[in-house]
A protein has these predicted regions:
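Short loop/turn motifs that connect adjacent beta-strands in outer-membrane beta-barrel proteins
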Residues: 36-46, 87-97, 139-158, 186-196, ...
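Outer-membrane beta-barrel transmembrane domain signature
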Residues: 204-294, 330
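Residues that define the transmembrane beta-barrel architecture of outer-membrane proteins
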Residues: 78-82, 125-133, 173-181, 219-225, ...
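Cleavable N-terminal export/targeting peptides
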Residues: 1-43
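Residues on the lipid-exposed face of transmembrane beta-strands in outer-membrane beta-barrel proteins
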Residues: 84-88, 133-141, 181-187, 200, ...
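Surface-exposed strand-loop-strand hairpins of Gram-negative outer-membrane beta-barrel proteins
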Residues: 56-81, 118-120
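Predominantly the C-terminal beta-signal and adjacent terminal strand-loop region
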Residues: 269, 278-331
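Transmembrane beta-strands of outer-membrane beta-barrel pores
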Residues: 52-58, 101-105, 161-169, 200-206, ...
Length: 331
């Protein structure tokens, strides 16, 4: 199992997100052997991290500025993001959980649609909580065979499942809830890992600008693809790796049944989220103690953020941002 911990921890670093994606590297093992006389831990691997990252310029759909010529452009938003993540592996699969607390600067103000008069916007930045869980069950481990493998191409196929949930104190007041289920494919690479999942995706959310009882919205069930990777950069002679994810959600409809009454609930577009981090194991470099402290820089691209599509008068749906942070493996 010596290859699993590094892969799992790299996956956790790559997913310090909000956002969507996500299970760590799978356990590739035959059926469990009989229990030894001295039972070991239930988990083959477990890692919990606390991290901080700074992101700029992030964007939010509808957060924009009007230029002198009357046109609109996206308003950049600095964000401070605090995260706790946990990953573990057991005989039959993996679990991954992450929670981001995202604090926006005043460019993305907090607000409510429930104030006296119906709308209020504050002079301080909004706070968002975004949680995500992904789990896998290895079909090879469950069957005690290697039937779910293609030598040299795929090491394992697993059942994959999970959910996302968020809340944010803006006037829009999103309360995203989604569930996913499908298959995960672990590719056979010389070092590190590349995993791809194909899911069915169902989302429920909230639009604070709709009137009751139509603030709660339910989107169509659509295909979703998640790709997670971590690859060591051994040729550098440094404890460096490149880690990240890509996430694709197909157009999921409007979310409302009465489109004539809520025409401003526009059709969603294909959503694409990609993040790539360059990760340095600082503990290994400085103290020769690996997997304790990581520092990272990265780039995030988000097209049609949360499915929203850009128009001439509606910006903030395309995000191109840089990030930098530090992560501590605590237990």
């Amino acid at each position: 199992m010596s290859g699993i911990p590094k892969a799992l921890m790299a996956a956790v670093v790559s997913l310090l997100v909000t956002g969507p994606v996500f299970a760590a590297d799978l356990v590739k093992a035959p059926a469990p052997a009989p229990l030894p006389d001295a039972p070991g831990s239930f988990f083959l691997f477990s890692d919990t991290q606390f991290s901080y990252r700074y992101q700029f310029p992030s964007s939010e759909p509808g957060v924009q500025v009007q230029n002198s010529d009357g046109s609109f452009s996206t308003r950049g938003i600095p964000k401070h993001i605090y995260n706790i993540s946990h990953a573990n592996a057991w005989a039959y699969g993996t679990n991954f959980f992450t929670l981001d607390i995202l604090k926006s600067a005043s460019q993305d103000p907090g607000g409510t649609t429930n104030a006296p008069g119906g709308f209020a916007q504050y002079d301080y930045g909004a706070t968002e909580a975004y949680g995500l869980y992904r789990g896998t069950l290895s079909l090879n481990a469950l069957t005690g065979t290697k039937a779910f493998a293609v030598p040299g191409i795929i090491k394992d196929i697993s059942l994959s499942y999970g959910f996302d949930a968020n809340a944010k104190n803006t006037a829009f007041g999103p309360r995203k809830r989604d569930v996913v289920g499908g298959l995960n494919f672990a590719f056979d690479v010389p070092a590190g890992f590349i995993n791809a999942s194909v899911h069915a995706y169902k989302e429920w959310n909230r639009n604070g600008f709709n009137t009751y009882p139509n603030r709660d919205v339910s989107f169509d069930t659509v295909p979703e693809i998640e790709i997670v990777y971590s690859l060591p950069l051994s040729f550098t002679g440094l404890p460096l790796s490149i880690a990240g994810f890509n996430n694709i959600v197909l157009p999921k409809g409007r979310g409302v049944t009465d489109v004539t009454a809520f025409a401003f609930n526009a059709k969603t577009g294909l959503e694409f989220l990609s993040r790539t981090n360059l990760v340095l194991d600082l503990g290994k470099l400085v103290y020769d103690t690996p997997n304790k402290v990581d520092v990272f820089i990265g780039f995030q691209y988000w097209l049609n953020k949360f499915g929203a599509q850009e128009t001439a008068t509606f910006k903030g749906t395309e995000e191109k941002s840089f990030l930098a942070g530090v992560s501590f493996h605590v237990f």
